[in-house]
């Protein structure tokens, strides 16, 4: 049911209203697992003006302050972190992708599992493709 709801007009409409970003389709849906020794360097996708990224966390008994949540930073620099979720039990972080939408995950040093679902919502057009990767309609001669 959850998966079907993600691809429903109702969900897309609600997320469009919530974010005020002209999204109309789910582009990526993936399960993620991070364990001891895992991390993600701070990075910025800046894939286009119409991308919303959602991380849904399902981790019971997560200790406040433990690394594992996707932190937000305006640059590709962990020391500039402005937000990091501390409760990963049935929680979510949603952000608009852009040139200052840096994010990453601090090094996980304990024997824990961070379980998450990552969803990218984006604007799509049958004529031009995704707002990030326009459809190439011209074939190169070989």
Features from the language model and the residues they span:
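Signature of the catalytic double-stranded beta-helix
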Residues: 1-28
């Amino acid at each position: 049911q959850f998966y079907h709801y993600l691809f429903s007009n109702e969900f897309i409409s609600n997320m469009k209203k919530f974010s005020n970003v002209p999204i109309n389709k789910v582009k990526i849906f993936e399960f993620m697992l991070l364990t001891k020794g895992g991390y993600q360097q701070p990075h910025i996708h800046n894939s286009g003006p119409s991308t919303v990224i959602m991380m849904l966390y399902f981790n019971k008994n997560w200790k406040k302050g433990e690394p594992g949540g996707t932190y937000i930073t305006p640059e590709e620099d962990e020391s500039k972190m402005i937000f990091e979720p501390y409760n990963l039990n049935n929680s979510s972080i949603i952000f608009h992708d852009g040139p200052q939408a840096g994010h990453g995950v601090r090094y996980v040093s304990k024997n824990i599992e961070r379980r998450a679902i990552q969803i990218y919502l984006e604007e799509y057009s049958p004529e031009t493709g995704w707002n990030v990767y326009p459809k190439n309609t011209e074939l190169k001669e070989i």
